A protein has these predicted regions:
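N-terminal maturation segment of proteins
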Residues: 1-223
Length: 223
């Protein structure tokens, strides 16, 4: 059922670009940002993550998207909001503008991947979708813009989101799998089966998630 909403690989870059632009428009209507702020999109492969925001400084961020991972429709806005507007890019841009430049707190020019700021940064980025879109606005935008761009049918979109809301309640199964896989000696194949059974993930998604868990370890609790 879920896989009918996978964005075709040759459409991913276009729909992510559109999503980031819409998230930017909505964010700038409420948050003042430097005139020169901008993001650029880089499509890549061979990574353990789906999306990654690399702040370059001077109010610019490169948003990397991993082509290897299937992108379902809900991830399009999620990636645009989480990685860019009003998520990681906006957070880093405001930290640079308010703390580094205005106050001279140069230590904030360094953004550690693992550190005390991670919980705040990821929590704020996760909340980005809800700041930018109401549930009704999100569905309307996906049905009228994203799905047509991707060549997908939106007839069952509401049903899909009811399913996805239930799926989201299984999120903490990932932390349990991470705990057993990293520290309890759980074999990789068993961990994949757990994610499939208790997290209702496909084998491909479960395998990619384990790669992320292995690389990022306890960082995964930030999500």
């Amino acid at each position: 059922f879920r896989d009918q909403f996978i964005i075709p690989a040759d459409k991913v870059e276009a729909v992510i670009t559109e999503s980031v632009a819409e998230c930017r428009r909505r964010t700038r209507a409420h948050i003042s940002l430097p005139d020169n702020e901008a993001t650029s999109l880089n499509m890549t492969t061979g990574k353990h993550w789906v999306g990654f925001a690399e702040f370059q400084g001077d109010s610019h961020t490169t948003v990397h998207i991993n082509r290897d991972v299937p992108i379902h429709v809900e991830r399009v806005i999620q990636l645009g909001c989480h990685e860019a507007y009003p998520g990681h890019h906006v957070h880093a841009t405001l930290v640079e503008a308010e703390l580094v430049r205005k106050r001279g707190w140069i230590e904030y020019a360094y953004i550690p991947l693992h550190g005390s700021q991670a919980v705040i940064a990821e929590g704020a980025a996760n909340y980005g979708v809800d700041l930018a879109f109401t549930p009704a606005e999100r569905i309307a935008y996906e049905r009228s813009v994203i799905l047509p761009m991707a060549g997908l049918d939106g007839e069952q979109l509401e049903l899909y989101y009811r399913y996805f809301a239930l799926l989201d309640q299984l999120n903490f199964a990932r932390n349990e799998v991470a705990r057993y896989y990293l520290y309890g000696g759980m074999p990789r194949e068993q961990a994949i089966e757990w994610l499939m059974e208790f997290g209702l993930e496909s084998r491909g998604t479960a395998s990619q998630r384990l790669d992320f868990i292995a690389a990022m370890r306890s960082y995964v609790i930030n999500y």
